[in-house]
Amino acid sequence: MKIKATFSCPHSLEEAKTIQENLKKKVILEDQFSEVNYVAGVDVGFRDNYQLTQAAIAVLSFPKLELVETQIACLPTTFPYIPGFLSFREIPAILKALEKLKIPPNIILCDGQGIAHPRRLGIASHLGVLIDLPTIGVAKSLLVGKHEEVPPEKGNWQPLIDKGEIIGVVLRSRTNIKPIYVSIGHKISLPTAIDYVMQCLTKYRLPETTRWADKLASNKGNMINLSKI
């Protein structure tokens, strides 16, 4: 997969904030894609006491959700762990993994936030703007915003609101299990993002895309045995 993105690594938090403020103006909050044949999940893990960043991508056919390709890339970790700035720590390895793909996805589901972020530029939005592809944020925990209690049955959701703005939804992806946090990444509307996340769910809390990517990213070895995942 050809990647034309130029990634800027900030040298200070102020510079990082400036980059986020500039890039958030480029986020597109409406559907800008046509046929979807492949969806991908992206997740990041760390090795060697966080000295190495390991990005994993799982590409699945859509709507059958059959795993068709996986790629992993590992790079030295160059940015510290700071909540709200994780994209600067994780995106370099993600871009390297994307470059290895032979099957380009039509939509990417990221393990993390989209616009459900203090400066409206979580990793899904940051990545989406850089590579100019539709992305969705699918997070396991809340970063910012408030919401009402979500009914316990699968498929129910409540809007996630911050400063009077709907920044995503809190979605019950599995009955009686903790919800997930879905937000626009780039080039997709919120209703469409919810729909694709729901279509990527099976019997687990996480969509199949990010569930596969999570297993790959957390693998400590260099070789991945897919038969054991």
UniProtKB/Swiss-Prot annotation:
The record marks Y81 as: Interaction with target DNA. Its main location: cytoplasm. PANTHER family: ENDONUCLEASE V (PTHR28511:SF1). It comes from Rippkaea orientalis (strain PCC 8801 / RF-1). InterPro entries: Endonuclease-V (IPR007581). GO terms for molecular function: deoxyribonuclease V activity; magnesium ion binding; RNA endonuclease activity, producing 5'-phosphomonoesters; single-stranded RNA binding. DNA repair enzyme involved in the repair of deaminated bases. Selectively cleaves double-stranded DNA at the second phosphodiester bond 3' to a deoxyinosine leaving behind the intact lesion on the nicked DNA. GO terms for biological process: DNA repair. Coiled coil: none annotated. It is found in: Cytoplasm. Its cofactor is Mg(2+). One of its GO terms (cellular component) is cytoplasm. This is Endonuclease V. Mg(2+) binds at D43, D111. Transmembrane segments: none annotated.
